[in-house]
Amino acid sequence: MNTKLTKIISGLFVATAAFQTASAGNITDIKVSSLPNKQKIVKVSFDKEIVNPTGFVTSSPARIALDFEQTGISMDQQVLEYADPLLSKISAAQNSSRARLVLNLNKPGQYNTEVRGNKVWIFINESDDTVSAPARPAVKAAPAAPAKQQAAAPFTESVVSVSAPFSPAKQQAAASAKQQAATPAKQTNIDFRKDGKNAGIIELAALGFAGQPDISQQHDHIIVTLKNHTLPTALQRSLDVADFKTPVQKVTLKRLNNDTQLIITTTGNWELVNKSAAPGYFTFQVLPKKQNLESGGVNNAPKTFTGRKISLDFQDVEIRTILQILAKESGMNIVASDSVSGKMTLSLKDVPWDQALDLVMQARNLDMRQQGNIVNMAPRRAACQRQSLLTSGKRHCRSGRAVFPKLPIEIQKCGRIPQHPALDNADTTGNRNTLVSGRGSVLIDPATNTLIVTDTRSVIEKFRKLIDELDVPAQQVMIEARIVEAADGFSRDLGVKFGATGRKKLKNETSAFGWGVNSGFGGGDKWEAKPKSTCRLPCRKQHFAGARDFSGALNLELSASESLSKTKTLANPRVLTQNRKEAKIESGYEIPFTVTTRSGGGNSTNTELKKAVLGLTVTANITPDGQIIMTVKINKDSPRQCASGNNTILCISTKSLNTQAMVENGGTLIVGGIYEENNGNTLTKVPLLATSPLSATSLKHSGKNRPPRTADFQLPPREL
C-alpha cells in the first residue's frame, strides 16, 4: 500500500514539474518552407518565452538534434513526415527539463538558427563536400522510437560523427572505409551565444579530447588549452562578438603546435564559470561582475540651520558684498572666485546666517567647498568641472595600475608599428593626442618581433586593437604587360627580259651596220655578230646586230611576282608586387659603345654599356572599391644595324611607354600603341621606247612595297 502511495506521489510530482516546465514556454507549431538555393526553413513557434536551441549534427544516420531548455511541447501531432530530397521527418519529444526536435535528413546536412519574433527559424542545407559514410559496426545509433513512445518517453542521446552547427570550413561528413571513428579535428568547433544575464557563453565541442583543459588568465585574455589535441589549419577561426554587448569581445580557436588553444578576449570586470556537460563538451560562461557604486547624489533630507540669527535688508547689492557680511557674521573665511559676480536684493529678518548663505548660493547657482575654516565659493558648473577632473584623476591613479605585457607582431615588422602617429609619445607641443599615456613607454624587441608596452590596462587594450588593425598582410597584385607587335608586308614586281642571237656567212661583203658587234675580216670569209643573248630590264645598253641576211633565235621572258607576309611578336613581362610597392623586371642585353671625350689637350676613349632590354617598372595602388591604379613604365629595346655614312654601326631601336592609369581588378586596359606604314612604288624603264603604246609593257619594270607595323601596350592586372 505504501509503495503504491509513493508511486502516486512521485507521479504527481513529475506531472507538476512537467506543468511548470510547460508554463515557461511551449512549442506550439512547426512549419517548413523552401528557399531557391535548396535550403529549408523550419519555423518553430512559441507561445511565451523563446529559447535559442543548442544542438548537434550526426552524419550516420543523417540527423540534426536541437534542445530547447525549460521548454514544453503543445502540439497535436509530434511526428511530421515530408517527401523532400533533404528533409524526411521531424520528431518532437520532451522530458522534465527540455524539449528536443530531431530532424531526420536524407543526406548529411548543416544548420543555422535565428530568432525572429516569437519564432525560431532553423536554416537547413546540405553539407559541403559530403561523402556517404560507410557502415561502422563498432558504433551504432539508437533506433528511432515510434511516434507515441517518442512523445511520452524521455529521450536518450546517441551521437555519431558529431560536427558543429556553425562550420567555418568545408568539412567532410565521413571518413574512409578503413576509418571507424572520426578524428577529433573534425569534431572540434566553437559556438557563442548570449544569455539573459548579459553573459557571454562559449561552447567548445572537442569529442576526441578525453582530458580536462588547462585554463589560464593573462590580463584580459582567458586561454583554454587542449593538450595533444591537434587542430587542422583549415578549422582555425575567429569570432568577433563585440556587438552582443557582453564582457566577451572576441573568441579565437587556433592550433599551437600539437595543442588546440581557445582564446577568449574580454573587457571590463567579469568572472568565469566553466562547466563540462559531457566528455569533449565544455561550456565557459563569462559573467559581468557587479560593481559597488560609491554613495553619492542628492540628499533629499530636510536641512537644519543652527547659525546665529541675523537680519539683512539690501537692495541691488553686489554678491561679493553680501558674502563679505556673512563671513563677518559667521566668523569663517570665505574665498570667492573671480567668476562670482552679479547683484541681488535681500530682505531677511531673524534668519540663521547659514540659512541666508544657503539662500544666496541657491539664488546665484553657487557651490561651496569647505576645507577646515576656509570656504571656497565658485559657480556650480565650474566647481563640478573641477571636481570631475579631480575625481577622474584619482580614479585613473587608483585603477591605472601599470602592466607591461608582450604584444607579438606576426606579419609586420615591429619597428614600423611605433612609427604610427597614435603611438608617438614625443609630443613637443604639449597637446597630447597619442595613444601612450604620460607615464607609459614602448620598447621594441627586434629579435622576437615583439612590442613591450608599459601602461594601464585601458591603454594596453587600445594597443591590442590598433595592432589587430595594423598587423595584417599587405595586398598583392600581379601586373602583366603585353606588348603586341604586328607587321603586314606586301610587294609586287612586273617586268620583261628578252634577247636574240644570230650567225651569218658573208662573201666579200661588209656589214651594213653594227652595234655591239664583234666583227672581224681575216683570212676567212666569215662575218659573225654576237649580241648578248638576254637583256633584263632595265637595260643600260641596247644590243642589236644586223646583216643583210641572217638566221638566229629570239628569247622573250615575262617576270611577275607578288609577296604577302604577316608577322606578330608578343612580349609578356609580368611581376608580382605588394600594394603601393614598386616592382621592376627586365631582360635583354648590355651593348658596349665607344665614347670619345675631350679632356685637357687631347681626347680620351671610354667604353660604356647601354641597355637594350624588355622591362616593366610598376607601382600598384589598390583602392577601397577594388580598382587598381598603376604607375607603369614599359620598355622594349632591340639592337639593330644602322648606316652611318659609308659604315654600318650597331644602334638600339626603342619602344617606351610611361603612364598612370586605373583599371578594375582582372580587366585589361590598352594604355597606348604605335602605328607605322611605309608605302613605296618603284619604276624602271627604257627612256623614250617605254612610252610607246606598243612596247611600253616590255621595256619597263615596276614594283610596289607597303609594310605597315603596329605596336600595342596592354595591362591586365590581377589582385591576389
Swiss-Prot record:
Gene Ontology BP annotations: establishment of competence for transformation; protein secretion
GO cellular component annotations of the record: cell outer membrane
Family matches, as InterPro entries: AMIN_dom, GspD/PilQ, NolW-like, NolW-like_sf, Pilus_4_PilQ, Secretin/TonB_short_N, T2SS/T3SS_dom, T2SS_GspD_CS
Pfam families tied to this protein: AMIN (PF11741), Secretin (PF00263), Secretin_N (PF03958)
Keywords from the named record: Cell outer membrane, Competence, Membrane, Protein transport, Signal, Transport
Highest taxon, organism lineage: Bacteria
Disulfide bonds: none
Subcellular location: Cell outer membrane
Location of region: Disordered: 697-720
Keyword set includes DNA damage: no
Keyword Transmembrane helix: no
Signal peptide: 1-24
Alphabetized Gene3D superfamilies for the sequence: 2.60.40.3470, 2.60.40.3500, 3.30.1370.120, 3.30.1370.130
Family the entry assigns: Belongs to the bacterial secretin family. PilQ subfamily.
Role played: Required for type IV pilus biogenesis and competence. Could function as a pore for exit of the pilus but also as a channel for entry of heme and antimicrobial agents and uptake of transforming DNA.
Subunit architecture: Homododecamer. Tetramer of trimer.
Protein name: Type IV pilus biogenesis and competence protein PilQ
Gene behind the chain: pilQ
